[in-house]
Amino acid sequence: MTGIFAEQTVEVVKSAIETADGALDFYNKYLDQVIPWKTFDETIKELSRFKQEYSQEASVLVGDIKVLLMDSQDKYFEATQTVYEWCGVVTQLLSAYILLFDEYNEKKASAQKDILIRILDDGVNKLNEAQKSLLGSSQSFNNASGKLLALDSQLTNDFSEKSSYFQSQVDRIRKEAYAGAAAGIVAGPFGLIISYSIAAGVIEGKLIPELNDRLKAVQNFFTSLSVTVKQANKDIDAAKLKLATEIAAIGEIKTETETTRFYVDYDDLMLSLLKGAAKKMINTCNEYQQRHGKKTLLEVPDI
C-alpha cells in the first residue's frame, strides 16, 4: 500500500513540475521568439527615412503607426519580463526543493509541498500577467494594421499623377532643374533656351519617371510592412490560445498537488525522477534568463 501511495505522489509531483516546465519551455522556445523584433526595429528606423516621400496627411498616419509598433513591442517585452521574474523565483525554490531530499522527514515533505504549490501559484499569476501584456501587444498590432490600410489608401491618392501632392513634387523638380539650367548659362539668350530645352527633356524623360519609381518603392515598403504586421498579430493570437491552455493545465495540477500527501517512502528511482524533473526546469529557467541577459546563473544542486 505504501508503495502505491509513493507512486501516486511521484506521479503528481513529477506532473506538477513537468507541467510548469512545459509552459515555460513553450514560452521560451516559441512565444518569446515568435516576433522578429530585430526586423521591426529596422523597420521603425526606415519609417523616418521616408518622411520626405509622402504628404502631411500620410505623415500623420506614419507617426501613428510608429507609436503603435513601439507600444506593441513594449507590451511584448513586459510579458517577457514577467516570465523572467517567475524564472527567478522557480530556480531558487526548486533548488531548495531538491536539497530537502537530504535526510528526508515529514517536516521537509511539508516544505516541499509548499514550495511546489508556490511555484504553480506564481506560475499561474505570472503567466496571466504575461497574457494581459500580450493582449495589449496584439491590440496595438491590430490598430497598426488598420492605420496601414488607411495609409495605403492615402498613398494611392498622393501618388496619383493627378494629385496635388504629386504635382507639387513635379513642380519642385522642375523648379530645381530650371534653376540649375539658368545657373549654368554661358552662351546668352540662345544658350538659355537650349539649357531650358535640355532641362525639360531631363525632367520629362528621367526625373518624373524616377519620381514615380521612388514613390512606388515607398508604397511597396508599407504594403510589405502591412503583411508583416498582420502575420505578427495572427502569431500572437495563436500563441495566446496555446498559453491559455498551459495556464489552465498548471491550475489543474496545482489543485491536485494541494490534495496530495507528500511524506512517503521514495525509492532511488522515484527520487531520481523527481530530482531530474526539478533540475530540468531549473535548466529551462537558466536558459530563458541567459537569453535575456542574465550573466550569473544558479547552479543546479547535485545531491
Swiss-Prot record:
Q: What is the disulfide pattern of this chain?
A: 87-285
- Give a yes or no for keyword Transmembrane in this entry: yes
Coiled-coil stretches are none
Record note on modification: In periplasm, it forms a disulfide bond, which prevents the oligomerization. In outer membrane vesicles, the redox status prevents formation of the disulfide bond, leading to oligomerization and pore formation.
Record Gene3D superfamilies: 1.20.1170.10
Q: How does it sit in the membrane?
A: Single-pass membrane protein
Job description of the protein: Toxin, which has some hemolytic activity towards mammalian cells. Acts by forming a pore-like structure upon contact with mammalian cells.
The protein depicted here goes by the name Hemolysin E
* Designated gene of the protein: hlyE
